Amino acid sequence: MNTSTKLICQKLFAEMLCSCIFGFAVYSAILNTKASNSSISSTTVGLTVCFSSISLIYTFCDHSVAHFNPAITIAAICTGKLDILLGIGYVIAQLIGFILATLLTVVCFPYGYLKTMEFIASARISDDISTVNLFFTEFILSFILVFIAFEVGINAIREPGVTLFVGIKQIDRSKFAPLTIGITLGFLAFLASTTSGGAFNPGIVWGPAIMGGNFDDFVIYIISELSGGLLGAFIQVFLLFK
């Protein structure tokens, strides 16, 4: 194995591990709150998403893209910010990571396989939530997340001559990206506790759906998250001239 191939394998493994840890953290928080009928479920999940994402981005950003979200990675591919083949590899690694995360929850919690999958599956909170409600909730949350991820991390530096502030030295905000993105993930998790549940990550939806065989609203989640993420990326890259 040559050095280049080894480096790519390390990047993909790191992204898989990163996604697995994030998925396990989120699924565990969901299981702990749903199984106990906790009245502070949205707070618990929101804080878990926030803190885990901050630590994981800081930890893995030197090894991989540390997206642990196919919506972000696909948006980076479509805007030319990430090599196509490597990006596809990252997406596959993320999906494998989330599948492993779902299996880890099964062996760590005493609810049995099917019940565990039922608890962690992404689903509309009640029958009162329409398909339109579900779609636009996930669309908007994904839009916000990907836009901010591009603004502070993926595409944080304007190209020379394109900035609106000609002659003014640009500030590199990428060093604050893990903190900013983590806080964003945290507050977004609070916004959909009565509608879609707040997934805004196709990987989070993918794991339990594939392993549990429950594809109710699966397509709606995936399409809304990917399209919302793409819009956020396109606006940041092309309309803001960055």
UniProtKB/Swiss-Prot annotation:
Compartments where found: Cell membrane
Cited SUPFAM superfamilies: Aquaporin-like (SSF81338)
Descriptive protein name: Aquaporin
InterPro entries in alphabetical order: Aquaporin-like (IPR023271), Aquaporin_transptr (IPR034294), MIP (IPR000425), MIP_CS (IPR022357)
Transmembrane segments: 12-32, 40-60, 84-104, 134-154, 176-196, 218-238
Motif NPG boundaries: 201-203
Segments on the Extracellular side according to the record's topology features: 33-39, 105-133, 197-217
GO molecular function: water channel activity
Source organism superkingdom: Eukaryota
Domain notes: Aquaporins contain two tandem repeats each containing three membrane-spanning domains and a pore-forming loop with the signature motif Asn-Pro-Ala (NPA).
Principal location: membrane
Similarity comment: family membership: Belongs to the MIP/aquaporin (TC 1.A.8) family.
Motif, NPA: chain positions: 69-71
Family matches, as PANTHER family: AQUAPORIN TRANSPORTER, MIP17260P
Gene Ontology CC annotation, any one: plasma membrane
Segments on the Cytoplasmic side according to the record's topology features: 1-11, 61-83, 155-175, 239-242
Function: Water channel required to facilitate the transport of water across membranes. Involved in osmotolerance.
Gene name of this polypeptide: AQP
Record keywords: Cell membrane, Membrane, Repeat, Transmembrane, Transmembrane helix, Transport
Membrane topology: Multi-pass membrane protein
Signal sequence range: none
